[in-house]
Amino acid sequence: MLGLRSLYIILFCCVFTAQAQHVFKGTVVDALSSVSIPNAHVKLNDSYGVVSDENGRFELSGLPSGTYLLEVSCVGFKGFKKQINLTKKVLYFDVVLQPDILELSQVDVLGQNERLTNITRLRSIEGTAIYASKKNEVILMESTLANKATNNSRQVYAKVPGLNIWESDGMGLQLEIGARGLSPHRTSNFNTRQNGYDISADALGYPESYYTPPSEAIQKIEIVRGAASLQYGTQFGGLLNFRLKKGENKPLEIIVRQTLGSFKLQNIFVSLGGSKGKWNYYSFYQKKSRNGWRPNSNSEAQTAFSSVQYQANDRLEFGLEITHMDYLAQQPGGLDDATFLSNPDTSFRARNWFRVNWNIAAFTVDYKFNERTKLNSRTFGLWSSRDGLGVLDRIDWSESGQQRDLLLAEFNNFGNETRLIRRYLIGESESVFLGGVRWYRGFTVKEQGLADSGSNANFSFENKLDHYGSYFEFPSLNKAVFVENLVRVNDCISITPGFRYDQILTEFDGFFHAVVNDSLYYTNNRKKLERGIFLAGLGVSYKCFLGGEAYANFSQNYRAINFNDMQVINSNIVIDPDLEDEKGFNIDLGLRGMAWGVLEYDLSVFYLNYSNRIGYLSDYYDSVSAPEPDDIYTSYRLSTNIGDSKTLGVESYVSWNVLKSFTDIETQALNIFLNTSFQKGTYVRSDEPSILGNRVEYNPDVNLKFGLQYQYKSFTSSLLYSYTSSQFADAQNTISPTQNALFGEIPSYSVVDWSAKYDKEKFLIEVGVNNLLDRSYFTRRATGYPGPGIIPSDKRNYYLCLQLKI
């Protein structure tokens, strides 16, 4: 009996000891900004409790197994309750708190000053994605002071280091940003997405973005640099993802915004959204028009969006989204250098038009197997077109009333991306596995020929088969598998290896014909490229660095030949028939965090290696190569693999909460921020002697933005100074401009913008002045639309916005 009793006691002690070893830990974060929340009270069954630390982390140990009621509360946030089942040794759980917005009529208190610092970072794990050790930025649009009616990129992206911005139109119809010496052309060096799915014309063959969501509808913009290539696609620039707003936690909320501005700018934006039961919905409609500050630059656009989410149960959620955008823009064409210096508001093209019709649909499924395992599947399609009409001859040649060139393009794409994320334990440290697959099918049709000789927006061919013209089909197919694994070595160090394998098919099939010396020539072209691409990456993060984080990342990149690189008819451009795909890698090394609760920083160095870089060489037609006799001895751009480049740079963002450093005043705040980028891009290999050792084009040495932001109760004001040093427009580093303005230096420029708003409960007023000092400058030399030639940026302009929330 004694032996049996002793055995019972031993077994009981073992069970009790096992029960006492359970640990419950996690992080408390803000649902709106993804910022960690300190001082949150975490309780289990009113028996166990703890307060989250300065990084939002909490841990409860010595817990017996069983079912618990988890309750989390924090001042300024809505309470959180959830039943959890504690059976495993260590249970990780992230708590997401919704802000508790109170409408105060008598007292105005700013509370936390994050509203001024509208930049934050992605958490290591967001939904079914891993961002640990990756350089990234998140722009919170609700706190961004900018001319949102025109999507003013200079203001919206003011706190993102190193971005080179093209300003091609004054109404924000197309976003054009680049980084680290990558061309800003329609943001084609980023993988551009909306709510996680593709929105560009063709993700591989034609990654240009003709659609940009209205700033008024965006909740936040997520930017992940080149290390995003493993999860989101192979682009050197990384990921640019627009997260649109969702319905508030109320049955119905209506927002109406009316904006008026210089050059007859008119913008109306209406949104409605809400939640009821298991349903959440959000819709908006925007219509805007503008005459432009140069002649022949009228434009009008409209955008509509609707989304609905259905939470079937605690595990399963469905979502459906539909987007439509269309616009018609008259384009005044480019200028040569002499005209820009003397009369930048001149236009030599009165018959150029551009038309876009963009349609996107997406269906999403989110399924939670348990607290550790989640699945996300996105199925999306795009049915869109873009058409260009006008005279694309050299800008230094005057118009003679000839027939206009017409370029039509249709894009029909369909794809699915499914990813699974799984949290697991290595010892007592939680690690995270992410695996995903992608299937993407694209089909693009491009036609080019002659239209009428009129001046209206008549997008119809005339005698297409009797004169010159072309018709090409561009099918593309992409199958990919990707894996990343976040391994936490301990509470401080994590390592994230990963890889991606893509099967890529791009091809074209079609013909073009032209009249040469009164004879009609037909040429059939067909080309097919099929290849497999393997990319690898590795990231390391150290989070016990004085309240901050040290991070490092290496990731390979790849860029497939663009459809435009395969075939184009443009007297300004000639395509090398032996083009090859581009490849390379990004390296980031940096420090980021918050010091003393008032100084936010992200300091990093990067290295970009770019092989087989496609660019332009300057050349001249001779009697054999000239497409027309009049073209002999005129210059053109040859698109070819010009060589290998490397870019090394320093990117930094620092924001100082001045008043919080010296006082405890809660009714006002003053922030100063400095965003700088110093970089040097050089061609280190080239078969062209005129290229080797040259600077990379569209890669300014210095890119700086300095801002002041002041807030007093409901009033906020912001002053922004932007400076970009001189840069080259071609790889041959042409300084003296050519007559057609395609080649030459882009001089340095500086711009000042001022914005202010008064936000009082349901009523809001926004005012501002862009290009406050009325500088005359330009950011690009265009080879085709909207040029060719120099595209002058807007002169000083004003805006006023009134908003009503119901």
For each predicted feature, which ranges?
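Structural signature of Gram-negative outer-membrane beta-barrels, strongest in the C-terminal barrel
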Residues: N313, S429-L434, R438-Y440, F472-N609, ...
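Membrane-embedded beta-barrel scaffold of Gram-negative outer-membrane proteins
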Residues: V270, W279, T364-G390, S541-K543, ...
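Face-selective signature of the C-terminal outer-membrane beta-barrel domain
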Residues: D314-M325, V356-H513, K543, D602, ...
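Transmembrane beta-barrel wall of Gram-negative outer-membrane proteins
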Residues: V23, E253, L260-S289, R294-Q330, ...
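Gram-negative outer-membrane beta-barrel transporters
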Residues: L420, D491, V605-N609, P629-N733, ...
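Short acidic/polar hinge/loop motifs at secondary-structure boundaries
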Residues: Y197-R225
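Surface-exposed extracellular loop regions of Gram-negative outer-membrane beta-barrel proteins
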Residues: L328-N343, F443-L450, L505-N517, K528, ...
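C-terminal beta-signal and adjacent terminal beta-strands/loops
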Residues: S611, S618, L659, L670-I672, ...
